[in-house]
C-alpha cells in the first residue's frame, strides 16, 4: 500500500499513573484511522500539533517508518480492511469500495447486504463480504465476548469494516439527512444515539457550521499556494450535498 492513503494510529489507554506497573491487558483500545493522512504530513505539520496529541503518540508510542502492504491502488475500503485484518485484499476480499456484480451487471458496495435493514438509513449493510477476522473480532474472542466493540466513521464502509463481524455496533453519517445511522446486523443501536438524532444531530446545527483553517493561513508554510487565498466553506450554502461534504471534511 503506497505512501499512506490511510494512516492508522493504535492507542492503548491504561488506568493509573505511568509510574505504576501496566496491566497485562489494557482496559481500552482505541484505533484512529485517518483517510488521506499521508505519513509525511505528520512531520510536515508537526509544529501545529498540541503536546498531548500526535506529538505525544510519536514521542511515546511505537512508530513504524517502513510499514507497507503488498497491493496497489488502495481506496478507503480496501485500506481499512487491510489495516484491521492485517491481510491484503486477495485474502480479506475487500478489493474496493465498490465493484461490478457480475450477476446483475450493476455496481455493488462492499458492505451492501439486503438481508439486514438500516437504522436511520435505507442502506442495507453487513460485513459479509469481509472474508477474514479483524482486530475487533479478535478482541471479542480474547475477552470471551465480554469486551464491547463500537466503530464510528463518516462513511458506512469504514464503520462496518472497522467493527468487523463480531462488533456491537457500527455507526456512520446519513448523507441525506445528517443523522447517525447503522445496521440491524449489529445487536446495538443505543437509545442515547436515538435521542441525539432527535435533538442534537448535525442537521440541527449545519447552518452554523463553517469550515475554516484553525490557524492563520500564513502559519501553513507547506501550503504556499493557499496563503494568499483564505479558505472558507459554508455547508448550508449547498442544498443537496451538504451532509456528504460535511462527512468528507475534518469537522465531522
Cite the ranges covered by each PLM segment.
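Generic recognition of stable, solvent-exposed alpha-helical segments in well-folded globular domains
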Residues: 32, 37, 49-52, 78, ...
Amino acid at each position: 500500500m503506497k505512501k499512506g492513503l490511510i494512516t492508522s494510529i493504535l492507542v492503548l489507554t491504561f488506568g493509573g499513573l505511568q509510574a505504576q506497573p501496566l496491566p497485562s491487558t489494557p482496559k481500552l483500545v482505541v484505533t484512529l484511522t485517518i483517510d488521506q493522512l499521508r505519513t509525511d504530513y505528520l512531520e510536515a505539520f508537526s509544529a501545529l500539533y498540541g503536546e498531548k496529541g500526535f506529538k505525544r503518540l510519536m514521542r511515546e508510542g511505537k512508530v513504524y517508518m517502513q510499514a507497507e502492504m503488498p497491493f496497489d491502488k488502495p481506496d478507503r475500503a480496501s485500506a481499512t480492511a487491510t489495516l484491521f485484518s492485517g491481510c491484503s485484499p486477495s485474502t480479506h476480499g475487500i478489493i474496493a469500495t465498490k465493484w461490478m456484480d457480475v450477476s446483475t451487471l450493476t455496481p455493488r458496495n462492499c458492505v451492501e447486504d439486503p438481508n439486514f435493514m438500516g437504522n436511520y438509513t435505507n442502506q442495507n449493510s453487513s460485513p459479509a463480504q469481509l472474508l477474514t477476522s479483524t482486530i475487533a473480532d479478535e478482541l471479542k474472542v480474547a475477552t470471551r465476548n465480554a469486551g464491547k466493540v463500537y466503530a464510528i466513521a463518516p462513511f458506512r464502509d469504514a464503520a462496518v469494516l472497522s467493527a468487523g463481524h463480531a462488533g456491537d455496533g457500527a455507526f456512520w453519517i446519513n448523507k441525506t439527512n445528517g443523522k447517525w445511522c447503522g445496521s440491524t446486523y449489529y445487536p446495538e443501536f443505543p437509545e442515547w444515539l436515538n435521542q441525539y438524532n432527535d435533538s442534537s444531530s448535525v442537521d440541527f446545527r449545519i447552518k452554523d457550521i463553517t469550515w475554516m483553517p484553525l490557524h492563520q493561513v500564513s502559519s501553513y508554510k507547506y501550503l504556499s499556494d493557499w496563503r494568499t487565498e483564505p479558505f472558507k466553506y459554508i455547508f448550508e450554502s449547498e442544498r443537496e450535498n451538504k451532509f456528504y461534504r460535511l462527512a468528507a471534511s475534518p469537522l465531522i
